[in-house]
């Protein structure tokens, strides 16, 4: 016969791995074509000029230049723009 009671299992002890979302390159900073500007879930920020959007809503630069953040339209959507570097 056992002399110890069976130990109960804890219902805690699990957590999901962080997804490292957010702004990766800030306003005024230089970026190369293909560089990631924002990692996001859904379109919290929208792609403006010279910015592409991946299937997971990641915003990335289409040209070399500097990043600029703006609010556009009557509903003040947050938009990310890349101002091309002078050639």
UniProtKB/Swiss-Prot annotation:
Residues 1-21 are annotated as: Disordered. The keyword Hydrolase does not apply. Disulfide bonds: none annotated. One of its GO terms (cellular component) is cytosolic large ribosomal subunit. It comes from the Bacteria. Keywords: Ribonucleoprotein, Ribosomal protein. SUPFAM superfamilies: Ribosomal L27 protein-like. InterPro entries: Ribosomal_bL27, Ribosomal_bL27_CS. Belongs to the bacterial ribosomal protein bL27 family. HAMAP family: Ribosomal_bL27. This is Large ribosomal subunit protein bL27. It comes from Burkholderia multivorans (strain ATCC 17616 / 249).
